[in-house]
Amino acid sequence: MALPSPQVLMGLPALLMGPAQHTSWPCGSAVPTLKSMVTFEDVAVYFSQEEWELLDAAQRHLYHSVMLENLELVTSLGSWHGVEGEGAHPKQNVSVEVLQVRIPNADPSTKKANSCDMCGPFLKDILHLAEHQGTQSEEKPYTCGACGRDFWLNANLHQHQKEHSGGKPFRWYKDRDALMKSSKVHLSENPFTCREGGKVILGSCDLLQLQAVDSGQKPYSNLGQLPEVCTTQKLFECSNCGKAFLKSSTLPNHLRTHSEEIPFTCPTGGNFLEEKSILGNKKFHTGEIPHVCKECGKAFSHSSKLRKHQKFHTEVKYYECIACGKTFNHKLTFVHHQRIHSGERPYECDECGKAFSNRSHLIRHEKVHTGERPFECLKCGRAFSQSSNFLRHQKVHTQVRPYECSQCGKSFSRSSALIQHWRVHTGERPYECSECGRAFNNNSNLAQHQKVHTGERPFECSECGRDFSQSSHLLRHQKVHTGERPFECCDCGKAFSNSSTLIQHQKVHTGQRPYECSECRKSFSRSSSLIQHWRIHTGEKPYECSECGKAFAHSSTLIEHWRVHTKERPYECNECGKFFSQNSILIKHQKVHTGEKPYKCSECGKFFSRKSSLICHWRVHTGERPYECSECGRAFSSNSHLVRHQRVHTQERPYECIQCGKAFSERSTLVRHQKVHTRERTYECSQCGKLFSHLCNLAQHKKIHT
């Protein structure tokens, strides 16, 4: 079967201008206009199904390119028309839809598929059928954004839009190269599968699906409808936060996160934005997980989640990372992953210069500078920059914690949190620091730790200028200035600035201590306290001061120590104006003004302002001295006493007086010494009113009265 050669195809554009350039017209006869002289139908080349299948990829590409060029030339000559105007000739009613495979001598069953359901006449072209049905139903789904006029076909809308754009048919593209690049979407081995082309070339290139025609189906039933977007362009944008969506149906659900509209309420507890969410929530209460994966046995509450999970077993992984061997289904995910190894960070913040490996992380980071928090909790008024953090926070109020640890009984709102917690019991630490070799049980703790080495502290307090390595630390710190304490203990009424501190405090009332040291059998209410305690036995001190070389077991202790060098005291007491280097010392100090002593010894009835003081005191009754000096073997009831004692051996005097330069081994001794310079006398005798600079001097004086 003879096929047109590339030379024949490439010569087609010349046919358009041929009559105007080479034809001689009789004298006195009317010269035909360009409009009547040539139409796209005159220069189009059609193939049968058999002919099309014989073309290779290069020939198909050439055919597609030439047809596009012909269409562009016809359009520029004004020969491309829809049937909106009266009296339009059927041959002029041609748009990109004619780039279809024509079926010569179609059988009657095929022709029947092309008849109008309303009045029955057969129409030769599927394009004509769509327009004819439009006249019957009066449905015009395509609207011009400039003037509001409605059209039956997307192609006619684009033709009309040329009136606004000055007759430039390719106005959606900056140049011809961009058009041809976009048209490659349609150049696959099977060119009849794409139902969306309006975003790629001039009109809807609704190419025929030949198999459906042969089987008697109606492949054109949706031709007059606006197709779903099949590109990566996100058309529907939220006016509140700028987030964009592919589907219009997704936007209303997202908008509910900004408004107070919560249309679905669970009778057991909790409010939901979508109906499917409340159905899923009911399965939390009933414990129903009916969908089980046959491959690995993992169970799911929704069939959709099971199907999504099964793709990990069945899908072919096309993209493999040569660095670590990990495979991916999608190219974009693969590209993002490769940046972990290459260190590439192409997205840079204009405000602070920090770079990110993908755009979503940059958008999230930019909210740190703008202070934008569009997601507000209706229960406590707390606002969040991300919807994921907002949804996670809501579980604090609903108390939905379906994931329980079989080891200690602790429950969690997320399965990932349970997996992370389980590593406390197993001792697993899969995330290792490449700088110092220290290992962590989760990736976020590793990322947090690495900032110790880099010194990166990108989050700055606008109130006092203090900077932090994490946004969560900045938010916690900002509550020092605002005095905000939204989390209240239902047992004693005490309020806290964050939920984690409240949860930690509640264990005082319950006495719960699920974390036990395998070395000395001491138990703790928090896993972090157990990890901290474990370093007493191992002697591990991974945090070193770059100024003096001193090492510490905890990063928080290093930060506190660093203020000895910087003289920084960011925490101010609202009662007396005194400044402190640590928030914990400020809280401890504030109890001097309030007289609050919530911790009572069950043995002797003595009250204490701090839990740690009660624990230290309790050892007076038990005689326990768990902290032993490695130099001389002397034992102490508290770690602080051991640290203080060790300075006798090391001769360390970290607390220096800025007035006279004298150094001291203990901070309390420095504070006492500074009163010599300030002449401050804060201790008053209740008997005679005499003032003293030191408490010990007051105690000595009181003996005169007794």
From Swiss-Prot:
PROSITE patterns, sorted: KRAB, ZINC_FINGER_C2H2_1, ZINC_FINGER_C2H2_2
Alphabetical GO biological process terms: regulation of transcription by RNA polymerase II
Residue stretches making up the KRAB domain: 38-121
Record keywords: DNA-binding, Metal-binding, Nucleus, Repeat, Transcription, Transcription regulation, Zinc, Zinc-finger
Zinc finger (C2H2-type): 114-136, 142-164, 236-258, 291-313, 319-341, 347-369, 375-397, 403-425, 431-453, 459-481, 487-509, 515-537, 543-565, 571-593, 599-621, 627-649, 655-677, 683-705
Gene Ontology terms: cellular component: nucleus
Record carries keyword Nucleus: yes
Subcellular location: Nucleus
GO MF term set: DNA-binding transcription factor activity, RNA polymerase II-specific; RNA polymerase II cis-regulatory region sequence-specific DNA binding; zinc ion binding
CDD domains registered for this protein in UniProt: KRAB_A-box (cd07765)
InterPro entries cross-referenced by the UniProt entry: KRAB, KRAB_dom_sf, Snail/Krueppel_Znf, Znf_C2H2_sf, Znf_C2H2_type
Function: May be involved in transcriptional regulation.
Entry similarity comment: Belongs to the krueppel C2H2-type zinc-finger protein family.
Official protein name in the record: Zinc finger protein 132
